[in-house]
Amino acid sequence: AFAAVLAFGAAPPQSKNFVTNVTRTATGSHLIGNPEAKDTLVEFVSYTCGHCAAFEREGAELMKAQYVATGRMKFEVRHRVLNVVDMTVATGVHCLPTAKFFTAHSAMLRSQDKWLAKASSATASQQARWKAGTPRDKMRAVASDIGLYDMLGRHGLSRSQLDNCFGDPAVYQPITDQTAAASKRGINGTPTFELNGVRLAAITARDVLFVLENAIKR
């Protein structure tokens, strides 16, 4: 009877929220979710891609809530860099601790219209600076012109830390390698999604969620 009372009064077991489980893969991509989940959705992304920003705004949080948080699916972000602005933002986001990647990733895509407008309106002399010198020189110039130092500063990254990452191949080379690997496989547009290694025709949030609804078992 005493055991029954203890059992009755015990708190129910807490289910784990797997969106707090972020890891970095051997190739430098970022993975969120249950490491034992059988299903994996991969997104090949560019930070200067309008459809990528639309997916982040319209479907990413719902996808994480329904499939990642519950442990049913893992979600991986790989880069398919399109230009020096994209490379600079990707390097900056990779400069953060692994646990902060998806927060900053989402923030940069959701605010894309603001900082990309600065890049689009850059003068010829500004754009010339983006092409001159070392990778560090180029990315520092872009970061200054689009306000990246301030944006990533909100995530705890100092200017000197970001500058160090711009000059560190250990930070930016995996992004370049992911891009080369994607290109070799014929992935030239973004976003491109793969579910368990099978490329999807879907690129919109609505279509991706429809595929997941029919493919991921509860």
Region locations from a protein language model:
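N-terminal targeting signals for export/organelle localization
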Residues: 1-23, 218
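C-terminal cap of thioredoxin/glutaredoxin-like
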Residues: 9-10, 14, 46, 138-218
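Functionally engaged cysteine thiol sites
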Residues: 18, 22, 95-96, 165, ...
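A short beta-strand-turn-helix
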Residues: 21-39
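N-terminal secretory signal peptides
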Residues: 39-43, 50-54, 217
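Short pre-active-site segment immediately N-terminal to redox-active cysteine/selenocysteine motifs
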Residues: 40, 45-48, 81, 189
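Structural alpha/beta surface segment adjacent to cysteine/selenocysteine redox centers
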Residues: 45, 54-140, 183, 215
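Proline-centered helix-kink/hinge sites
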Residues: 50, 61, 191-192
